[in-house]
A protein has these predicted regions:
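Juxtamembrane intracellular "pre-TM" segments in multi-pass secondary transporters
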Residues: 1-12
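Intrinsic disorder in cytosolic terminal tails and internal cytosolic loops
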Residues: 187-210
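A late C-terminal transmembrane helix in Major Facilitator Superfamily
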Residues: 128, 132-163
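Short amphipathic helix-loop junctions that connect adjacent transmembrane helices
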Residues: 28-45
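Intracellular juxtamembrane helix-capping segments at the cytosolic ends
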Residues: 115-130, 140
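C-terminal ends and interior cores of transmembrane alpha-helices
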Residues: 81-98
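Helix-to-loop junctions at the C-terminal end of transmembrane segments
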Residues: 58-75, 161-162
Length: 210
């Protein structure tokens, strides 16, 4: 209840619900795309582990640097944009056809963006917590962030692919990420990010955007 007494709390909750829609939809279909394009299980494993894993680790490292250098708000906004735009790489792969370089680029970019977001967005969610109720509030925030994803299944994504095709589907997932990005930007401009953070936020995260 303490969270909902903060200014802008309902908009923050709406952002938590919306911010992963595009990313979740896209992630449900990567294996289906790779199978339909003719990649073998061994090829998928090589790209996913050999490139995706390391790209994710690099993204985590860069995310930490961005958070420290440009602050919470701008680093979160940048990570949201990167995660949304990363879906375009799979639209390009689907349009290009089977390509080793295309596969490497798409998986690398997606995992790199996810690594950055894994640092900055989690840090933002942590900053929303009151130190008196950190465990309970973070658990509720994490649960809220996954609610929409529970309604988005492989069947849902598969139906959209059948209707639109892969290229248009990944363009759609990029558009689906836009409401979360726009909402966070509007909250930044209105000062609601600062107003909604809890006592777990640091002095750096409480500074207004430059």
């Amino acid at each position: 209840l303490e969270f909902f007494r903060r200014r802008g709390a309902m908009l923050v909750l709406l952002f938590i619900l919306l911010h992963k829609i595009g990313d979740t939809l896209a992630n449900l279909t990567f294996r289906l795309l790779f199978d339909d394009m003719g990649y073998s299980n061994d090829e998928i494993a090589i790209y996913d582990i050999g490139i995706g894993f390391w790209a994710y680790l690099i993204g985590i490292f860069i995310g930490g640097i961005l958070y420290a250098r440009i602050g919470m708000k701008r680093s979160v906004l940048l990570s949201l944009i990167l995660m949304g735009v990363s879906n375009l790489s799979f639209a390009a792969l689907a349009a290009l056809g089977k390509s080793n370089w295309g596969m490497a680029g798409a998986i690398g970019f997606e995992n790199f963006a996810s690594g950055i977001g894994g640092v900055t967005v989690v840090a933002y969610f942590s900053a929303l917590c009151d130190l008196r109720f950190t465990a309970a509030q973070y658990a509720l925030i994490s649960a809220a962030a996954s609610i929409v994803g529970r309604f988005l299944t492989g069947t849902t994504a598969g139906g959209l692919i059948e209707q639109f095709g892969y290229v248009d589907f990944y363009l759609f997932t990029t558009l689906a990420a836009m409401p979360g990005i726009a909402l966070f930007w509007l909250m930044m401009r209105a000062g609601l990010i600062d107003a909604s953070v809890g006592t777990a936020a640091t002095d750096r995260t409480a500074q207004p955007p430059e």
